[in-house]
Every structure is written in structure tokens, then in C-alpha cells.
Amino acid sequence: MVTRQSTIILIIKLLFMSVLLNLKKVNLKYQTGKDNIRVLKDINLTTKKKETISIVGESGSGKTSLIMLIGGLEKATSGKIFFQNHEITKLSEDEVSEIRRKSIGIIFQSFYLIPNYSAVENV
């Protein structure tokens, strides 16, 4: 059972109306020494225009790893990620960074505000 204390909610807001996100059989493994730890297995996700999605799950269930993949901050071990019908899994880091800056907003449930900054400056 997922309780309030063990749940972290991550919200992805796709900022541009034309944005479409599609994940196909995405997998992510982390290498720790000689071992591979599978974090995500065969994730499929499709978003529609103007859609806001929430990812809810227990601590350690892979929510942050999924967000990092969508935001281009991690590379999938396998599978494909499409953004505006372009496969971003084949793009360079610079190209993915440009897309992220222009089109993807990520809000984590726990965040820290910088004192003396306005709400806009903290974003």
C-alpha cells in the first residue's frame, strides 16, 4: 500500500502546446561495480498535447530516474524516447539540452527556495 509518507509525486508539465512525448520500451540500468541494477523495465508512455501527467509511487520505485530520462539528464540503456516526433535518444547532449531548456518543465514535490528571490526567480 502506498502511504502519504512513502509517496513522492513528480509532475511533468509539457510547456508548449505542440509537445508530444512518447517512450517505447525504455529501460534503464545503473552499473555499480560489477553489478547492473535495473531501475526501469520496458516503460511505455504517451502524452497528448497540453497534458499534465503525475508520476506517483513508493520511494525507490524509479520515479526520479524516469524524470531524469524524460528531461534528458540520463540516457536510456535501451528503448526509444520521442519528443515532438523526434527521437531524442539519438541526439547529442547539446541538442537534448536545448530541447529541455525550451520545452520541458520538471517540478519535484520537495524543493528548496532561495531566500530573497521572487517566485519567478526561484523557478
Language-model regions, residue ranges each:
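ABC ATPase NBD coupling module
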Residues: 88-105
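The feature captures the beta-strand-to-loop junction immediately N-terminal to the Walker
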Residues: 56-58
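Short coil-to-helix segment of the ABC ATPase nucleotide-binding domain corresponding to the Q-loop/switch region
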Residues: 117-122
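A short, flexible loop at the N-terminus of ABC-type nucleotide-binding domains that lies
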Residues: 17-20, 29-42
